[in-house]
């Protein structure tokens, strides 16, 4: 029997691992909402799993609209069973994923993309630096939803010039560093 060279086995293993991560799903109950883009899901085996919503960035808790963003997300998902389509893991070890929740409507139920709902309602930005890992078509929908929310002055867009969370975090780091000197 002929064997594959080790470099091919390594490449094949890496490919299968990335496909496995991309195809992974977590189904569980949301037991905590940290802020407007981070939840904790009680995964199978009673495993609390932190999930960062993919492709969005919501105001931080101490930032203007931070509490409103967190509350909107909590209203959508807290105590409910969600499905997380895993996109990646971040540098903090959190799952990064697209969160889906079933919502009841008069004639049944609809599955809502929670990440998109946060943007549509003006409770988060489309996080352009991290859109490339999303499934086909999602990035465009997220950017379009942000544009619509801005034009119709939804949520944080009622402010004339809301500060994006990535800029706010950078400003906070600068303040801490200048205060330490």
Segments (PLM) and residue ranges:
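Small beta-barrel nucleic-acid-binding modules, primarily SNase/OB-fold domains
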Residues: 2-12, 16-181
């Amino acid at each position: 029997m002929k064997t594959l060279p080790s470099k091919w086995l390594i490449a094949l293993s890496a490919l299968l691992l990335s496909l496995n991560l991309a195809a992974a799903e977590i189904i569980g109950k949301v037991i905590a909402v940290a802020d407007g883009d981070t939840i904790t899901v009680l995964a199978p085996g009673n495993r609390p799993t932190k999930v960062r919503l993919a492709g969005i960035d919501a105001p931080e808790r101490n930032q203007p609209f931070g509490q409103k963003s967190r509350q909107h997300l909590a209203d959508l998902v807290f105590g409910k069973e969600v499905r997380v389509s895993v996109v990646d893991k971040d540098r903090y070890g959190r799952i990064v994923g697209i969160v889906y929740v079933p919502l009841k409507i008069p004639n049944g139920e609809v599955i809502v993309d929670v990440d998109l709902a946060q943007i549509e309602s003006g409770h988060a930005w489309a996080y352009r630096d991290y859109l490339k890992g999303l499934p086909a078509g999602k990035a465009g929908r997220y950017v379009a939803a942000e544009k619509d929310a801005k034009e119709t002055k939804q949520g944080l867009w009622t402010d004339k010039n809301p500060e994006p969370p990535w800029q706010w975090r950078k400003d906070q780091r600068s303040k801490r560093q200048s205060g330490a000197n």
